[in-house]
Amino acid sequence: MPKYRSATTTHGRNMAGARALWRATGMTDDDFGKPIIAVVNSFTQFVPGHVHLRDLGKLVAEQIEASGGVAKEFNTIAVDDGIAMGHGGMLYSLPSRELIADSVEYMVNAHCADAMVCISNCDKITPGMLMASLRLNIPVIFVSGGPMEAGKTKLSNQIIKLDLIDAMIQGANPNVSDADSEQIERSACPTCGSCSGMFTANSMNCLTEALGLSQPANGSLLATHADRRDLFLNAGTRIVGLAKRYYEQDDASVLPRNIANKAAFENAMILDIAMGGSTNTVLHLLAAAQEGEIDFTMSDIDRLSRKVPHLCKVAPSGQKYHMEDVHRAGGVIGILGELDRAGLLNREVNNVLGKTLPETLEAYDVMLTKDESVKRMYSAGPAGIRTTKAFSQDCRWDSLDTDRQEGCIRSREYAYSQDGGLAVLYGNIAVDGCIVKTAGVDKESLIFRGPAKVYESQDDAVEAILGGKVVAGDVVVIRYEGPKGGPGMQEMLYPTTYLKSMGLGKSCALITDGRFSGGTSGLSIGHASPEAASGGIIGLVQDGDMIAIDIPSRSIVLDVAENELASRRETELARGDAAWTPHNRERQVSFALRAYAILATSADKGAVRDKSKLGG
């Protein structure tokens, strides 16, 4: 029978000092022996996805206490990728994932907590907490802050849906008036919550459902809706039950590594491909798998991407649907239901509800359930009122979207495409693979060939795009922006956005060893591995080199002879200590980022730390 971890600090005369300090936090004799649950919050006023979380930790804590546990809350940092975008702040985004994972480990292990409720939401916070959960392997439930309502505005006498990406595109479009640009900007992000499309934050929150570590509707129920309160209350109750099952009944099935096992990781990736999730999810799933010592690699992602159809097309891949529409159609469970009926899921998996996948689908799939309370939950809709407060409205759709032919979520028979929303490409420019969000690529661009325009920083690429130096047919190559070379693997949202602003979104390709925002669409290929700073061939590309991209064949090739590449490599190595660094780039890099770069691996490994350098 496993012993409560917290007993280390609450039992025995030698722990009198620790108990004295626990008493100073409000604990009493009756509390010693109860499970101590860490409530891991990520409230901050910097991030709209987290601005409403201040009191939600208390909500969970009160429910934990009422259910027989002891709740202790602490906070992690949270970086807003949208605000950090387009300047030096973006260098800190991906490294913050490791800091979040470490800070959770530090707090939980230092104080011997028995279990966790992780209150996450945005881009690096959910992945960081997920990495920590699998590293620590103690009972955990994720409950996110929820998605933002989609923005809406009236242009040309027509009501249109908006999100952050629309504001960015139109803000840089010289053909859009100042008045229209300002109207879009003011309307794009109307409420608290994670940005309203299938961007990285919402993608990751959806994947926690497929991994079995969060409750149904976690990924899709709006941040503003009153129904979301129940997710927090239920998380507080359920985590005490999970802790007692493990520590008092020796039931290891409730541990995250046994719930989020390889079969669950495959299901999460299948969901991601089917819903055209952010390419960043690949990076984060690979990282989380390594933390959990789960054998899940790029090869698995490549294998799965070849058989999974695209069942749910959401912004930024199209503007008709946002997360509020996914929820109306049944949310993540609705997509999983269609994937299950297509025979694509591993069914022998469990979740924090204590249910198998078939049991969960029977109870929560809107196409199967007879439970009116479940249908009511999925009818939760937007209010269209600007607010930063959670649970502030109770609006309902008049009906659910159960149209699996032409609705938001499709059956396999009526899929948006039989080829899924993400693909892994291989070739000499990315020997270890690279990622493209096929959900956002026009059919006419699936096969593309063009001359390279090479830039060694995002800033130089943006200047060239806005300056008219990039023309239709070009392949923009941005290198030395990987985990080690950036350092920090910046998102290339501004270059892809400005290509659209300049009318080049469908006539150019972009390849980088950096990564993309979940808001990116178009022929945007990221995570090229090995990265330039690790000696990858992307570091040898020259202006004018022809690059051939064939997504159906999963290939990407730099059309340069092997002997010429060998000659270029010798020239690069002759630079000595300067080899595999930018030839002409001025960038201030802090010691914190340099420390990150020393241990960073390329994207095909999830950009995690190189354990071999630490003796691991």
Curated annotation (Swiss-Prot):
[2Fe-2S] cluster binds at C122, C195. Signal peptide: none annotated. GO terms for cellular component: cytosol. Its EC number is 4.2.1.9. The modification N6-carboxylysine is found at K124. It holds the Pfam family ILV_EDD_C. Pathway: Amino-acid biosynthesis; L-isoleucine biosynthesis; L-isoleucine from 2-oxobutanoate: step 3/4; Amino-acid biosynthesis; L-valine biosynthesis; L-valine from pyruvate: step 3/4. Binds 1 [2Fe-2S] cluster per subunit. This cluster acts as a Lewis acid cofactor. It is an enzyme of class 4 (lyase). Mg(2+) binds at D81, D123, K124, E491. Its cofactor is [2Fe-2S] cluster; Mg(2+). One of its GO terms (biological process) is isoleucine biosynthetic process. The active site is at S517 (proton acceptor). It catalyses: (2R)-2,3-dihydroxy-3-methylbutanoate = 3-methyl-2-oxobutanoate + H2O; (2R,3R)-2,3-dihydroxy-3-methylpentanoate = (S)-3-methyl-2-oxopentanoate + H2O. Keywords: 2Fe-2S, Amino-acid biosynthesis, Branched-chain amino acid biosynthesis, Iron, Iron-sulfur, Lyase, Magnesium, Metal-binding. InterPro entries: Dihydro-acid_dehy_C, DihydroxyA_deHydtase, DiOHA_6PGluconate_deHydtase_CS, ILV_EDD_C, ILV_EDD_N, IlvD/EDD_N. Functions in the biosynthesis of branched-chain amino acids. Catalyzes the dehydration of (2R,3R)-2,3-dihydroxy-3-methylpentanoate (2,3-dihydroxy-3-methylvalerate) into 2-oxo-3-methylpentanoate (2-oxo-3-methylvalerate) and of (2R)-2,3-dihydroxy-3-methylbutanoate (2,3-dihydroxyisovalerate) into 2-oxo-3-methylbutanoate (2-oxoisovalerate), the penultimate precursor to L-isoleucine and L-valine, respectively. Homodimer. Belongs to the IlvD/Edd family. This is Dihydroxy-acid dehydratase. The gene is ilvD.
